[in-house]
Swiss-Prot record:
This is NADH-quinone oxidoreductase subunit C. Belongs to the complex I 30 kDa subunit family. Its EC number is 7.1.1.-. NCBIfam families: NuoC_fam, PRK06074.1-1. Gene3D superfamilies: NADH:ubiquinone oxidoreductase, 30kDa subunit. Keywords: Cell inner membrane, Cell membrane, Membrane, NAD, Quinone, Translocase, Transport, Ubiquinone. It is found in: Cell inner membrane. It comes from Aromatoleum aromaticum (strain DSM 19018 / LMG 30748 / EbN1). It comes from the Bacteria. HAMAP family: NDH1_NuoC. GO terms for molecular function: NADH dehydrogenase (ubiquinone) activity; NADH:ubiquinone reductase (non-electrogenic) activity; quinone binding. NDH-1 shuttles electrons from NADH, via FMN and iron-sulfur (Fe-S) centers, to quinones in the respiratory chain. The immediate electron acceptor for the enzyme in this species is believed to be ubiquinone. Couples the redox reaction to proton translocation (for every two electrons transferred, four hydrogen ions are translocated across the cytoplasmic membrane), and thus conserves the redox energy in a proton gradient. It catalyses: a quinone + NADH + 5 H(+)(in) = a quinol + NAD(+) + 4 H(+)(out). The lineage of its organism: Bacteria, Pseudomonadati, Pseudomonadota, Betaproteobacteria, Rhodocyclales.
């Protein structure tokens, strides 16, 4: 690990203290994990503390870990990951938190910290069903208004539930149940040992 990443890891531990669940450095990237209850406070500290100064939010995404890894996943299902940039210190970091409730995954909104996260949170809501308390306009952004479900969840069927088509008799687009037979898609992956140098970062 480079001295720059060591300094960042040490600063995160010292400044965030008990809020830190883990700090992992892998392949030159730092991932900071905090509890969902500490997510907003940690984000504010990452932005405002003079030794961190993560002024810019690059991206926010949802994660569904229900089919993660080689075996059955036993941890919490849903997480949110935020990618941040410190222009002051030339650092990048990934902030991750797992939702406490898999049935109703909830996080505090970061719109008050980085206003540009607004549409990213709407996207995570739309595609993963993640809720963001305090968001000023949490509604779907990519799927149709009447869309049922959240298409990036691992249990969402590949073919979906309904399909759209133009009905010339009615002169409009109509929804109907999917006409494709559902099937299980299991890709066959053959990898050599140490493929992509995984685990050696």
């Amino acid at each position: 690990m480079s001295s720059k990443l060591e300094r960042l890891s040490s600063s995160l531990q010292n400044i965030l203290g008990a809020k830190v669940r883990s700090v992992v450095v892998d392949r030159g990237e730092v991932t900071l994990e905090v509890a969902a209850a500490d997510y907003l406070a940690a984000a504010q500290m990452l932005r405002d503390h003079r030794d961190l100064r993560f002024e810019e939010l690059i991206d926010l995404t949802g994660l569904d870990y229900s089919a993660y890894g080689n075996g059955a996943w036993t941890g919490k299902r849903f997480a949110v990951a935020v990618h941040l940039l410190s222009l002051t210190h030339n650092w990048r970091i990934r902030l991750r938190a797992f939702a406490d409730d898999d049935a109703f995954p909830m996080f505090e909104s970061l719109v008050g910290v980085w206003p540009g996260v607004n549409w990213y949170e709407r996207e995570a809501f739309d595609l993963y069903g993640l809720m963001f308390a305090g968001h000023p306009d949490l509604r779907r952004i990519l799927t149709d208004y009447g869309f049922v479900g959240h298409p990036f969840r691992k249990d969402f069927p590949v073919s979906g539930y309904v399909e759209m088509r133009y009905d010339p008799e009615q002169g409009r687009v109509v929804y109907q149940p999917v006409t494709i037979e559902p099937r299980e898609n299991t890709p066959r992956i053959v990898r050599e040992e140490n493929y992509g140098d995984v685990g050696n970062g």
